[in-house]
Amino acid sequence: MTSTQAVSFDTFQLAAATADLSDESAASDYADIVEFRLDLAYADTSLPDPLTAISAYDHSSSLPLIVTNRPEWEGGAYDGETIDRLEMLITAAKHDAVIAVDIELETLKSQHGKKVARDIRNSGAVIIASTHDFTSTPQQSVLHERLHTAAQLGDIGKLAVTAQTHRDALRVLAATEQASQWGDTVATMAMGALGQHTRVVAPLYGSRIGYAPVNPTDATAPGQYDIKTLSEMIDTLTHTKVEDD
């Protein structure tokens, strides 16, 4: 298990994605961080209020948190007002357990989004600027531009697209490697069956965050492995690479 103080996005971090912070204990053997989906928790009436759940979270002995409050227009579950959605993120970032906040790239392009990012950074959390395409993979030049812009507006640029061909997956890996060469800190993956393997190999090309649900039935994006499976595959691949080198 990784302590909050020890986490650095200079190296790869594996995040267990969940709407229920009680999943942390099951994830702690495999994950470095928990991605807490406020939008999914807020939409599920059987779960505690997400901000209350963060307040009750024992950060001293638990994994640190990335908080995400994804709107419906970016594939999430939050259907309320933008100002309320972002205020939840600002409030969440004030808790010691929260080390990173995910905000959509389109939101960060607005003046209000930039102000929200400043407020969150003032609380000590970093910004993950995320962009998603749930239907296709853009051309290489678009991938480079979108990922670089995300890395500039955020502290980490996150790009998730949908692979319709194996070549799409290769383009994502190429964009990841190029971004790393430019000095950008990025997290990348290709969603869908044809992009599933990128979740395992992207760290070799410079991706700094991987995402997986604790339970495969709770996947928050197409093509996700469960946290145990992804952790074991990445560990095997990384150790094999070290031995080959």
Curated annotation (Swiss-Prot):
SUPFAM superfamilies membership: Aldolase
Active site: 132 (proton donor/acceptor), 158 (schiff-base intermediate with substrate)
Reactions performed catalytically: 3-dehydroquinate = 3-dehydroshikimate + H2O
Keyword Amino-acid biosynthesis: yes
Binding, 3-dehydroquinate: 35-37, 70, 199, 220, 224
Keywords assigned: Amino-acid biosynthesis, Aromatic amino acid biosynthesis, Lyase, Schiff base
GO BP terms in the entry: 3,4-dihydroxybenzoate biosynthetic process; amino acid biosynthetic process; aromatic amino acid family biosynthetic process; chorismate biosynthetic process
MF GO annotations: 3-dehydroquinate dehydratase activity
Biological function: Involved in the third step of the chorismate pathway, which leads to the biosynthesis of aromatic amino acids. Catalyzes the cis-dehydration of 3-dehydroquinate (DHQ) and introduces the first double bond of the aromatic ring to yield 3-dehydroshikimate.
Complexes and interactors: Homodimer.
Family to which this protein belongs: Belongs to the type-I 3-dehydroquinase family.
Protein name (database record): 3-dehydroquinate dehydratase
Gene from which the chain derives: aroD
